[in-house]
Amino acid sequence: SLNIELHKMTVFMIIPKAIQDLALPFVDRYFTAILSEAVQDGLVQAYLNGDGKNAPIGIMRQINTTDTDGTNKAKTVLTTVKKFSPKGLAPIRKTLSNNGLRTVGTLYLLCNPNDEAEYVDPALYGEALTGGYRNTSFLPIEKIVDANVPAGKAIITIEKAYVMGLSSVSMKTYDQTKAMDDADVIIGKAYGNGRAIDDNTAVVFDVTKLEEYVLPVTQVTTPAS
């Protein structure tokens, strides 16, 4: 069957009429930029953790399993990822391969800015023998840092694994709604939906379990002659 259910995304802003009366050239661009940023932020939240009831199904949620309130259940958080080594990433790569049915290339790691500084970078980068720091991962990992990722959790996903459709964003100004406050209300809205192609396209893990990378050093003792 074809599911054509759509969800409405709404953004709004209240603007004092006095600002409009000034007719400064940058005012319209400034308000448009703020509303555009709000739309983008809403789309990111929906992609990450949309509840599937009043929003798209986020990659942190299960597609076909719901709670009693009608929202899609959160995925189980993996707590065994401690290193970005072949062994450390094996459980994640096995899941992303969908039980061996697809090849996994570049991994995309989504994390909160605080967790990037405290956990991700110390585990991902290490001192090189020649000085400086290097990426210690054995395969490509691309970081995507966003404040919408919940602190303490991170997600590893793959490309071309999420489908989202969105209508154009329409903006309308209401000049009487807040008349007593001498203000205009601008409301923008769009319709859309989205979901991952399957539950195995993204893995949520406890980022606080990551261990700092330590350069392995082997001490060799030369036997006395």
Model-derived regions: residue spans:
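Alpha-helical scaffold segments that mediate packing/assembly in large oligomeric complexes
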Residues: L2-R93, V204-A224
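Short helix/loop capping segments that flank catalytic or ligand/cofactor-binding pockets
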Residues: L22-L24, E118-V120, R195-I197
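Beta-strand elements of well-folded, non-transmembrane domains
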Residues: D41, A190-G194
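Extended oligomerization regions of viral-like shell subunits
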Residues: K53, I57-A190, V214-S225
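Tubular lipid-binding modules of the TULIP superfamily
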Residues: D199-T201
